[in-house]
Amino acid sequence: MPLLDSFKVDHTVMKAPAVRVAKIMRTPKGDDITVFDLRFCVPNKEILSPKGIHTLEHLFAGFMREHLNGDSVEIIDISPMGCRTGFYMSLIGTPNEQQVADAWLASMRDVLTVQDQSTIPELNIYQCGTYTEHSLADAHETARHVIEKGIAINKNEDLLLDEKLLNL
């Protein structure tokens, strides 16, 4: 099985909260697709709660689009990582890390303005696979954590995993 790019970076030295360009691809028609690692938690030291990450998934996807989409950027998808330490964001365009960090920070401020769980978008049996598994309180706690710590930038060259550690 091929080694995925996300496993070629050293998770023991990753900063969080932090933005990292995980991959840039060019389509056959010439469009750039950028995948960002939006790391909310320090790997193996912090973790997002299942209910909190689910609520963030519903809120973060919309708020990031409000703050980042424009003439040269369109978000395709924002999905939680299986390890529950962050999200991957795929988009058309090549915004820089600081633009993404600014949009992320603004989105966390927006999360804090949501005061009633009943106003979370798509939180119903028809549009959500586990609509009862949400926590606005946990999402607020995560948003406050990101705002208080600020958002750093992780560079791939600083995180390159030593080849001796690959496929242990």
Swiss-Prot record:
GO BP field? quorum sensing
Record-listed E.C. numbers:
4.4.1.21
- UniProt-recorded Gene Ontology molecular function terms: iron ion binding; S-ribosylhomocysteine lyase activity
Q: List the catalysed reactions.
A: S-(5-deoxy-D-ribos-5-yl)-L-homocysteine = (S)-4,5-dihydroxypentane-2,3-dione + L-homocysteine
Residues binding Fe cation, per UniProt: 54, 58, 128
Keyword field contains Metal-binding: yes
The cofactors required by this protein are: Fe cation
Signal sequence residues: none
**Which Pfam families does the record associate with it?**
LuxS (PF02664)
Q: How does it assemble?
A: Homodimer.
Q: What function does this protein fulfil?
A: Involved in the synthesis of autoinducer 2 (AI-2) which is secreted by bacteria and is used to communicate both the cell density and the metabolic potential of the environment. The regulation of gene expression in response to changes in cell density is called quorum sensing. Catalyzes the transformation of S-ribosylhomocysteine (RHC) to homocysteine (HC) and 4,5-dihydroxy-2,3-pentadione (DPD).
Tell me the protein's name: S-ribosylhomocysteine lyase
Organism per entry: Mannheimia succiniciproducens (strain KCTC 0769BP / MBEL55E)
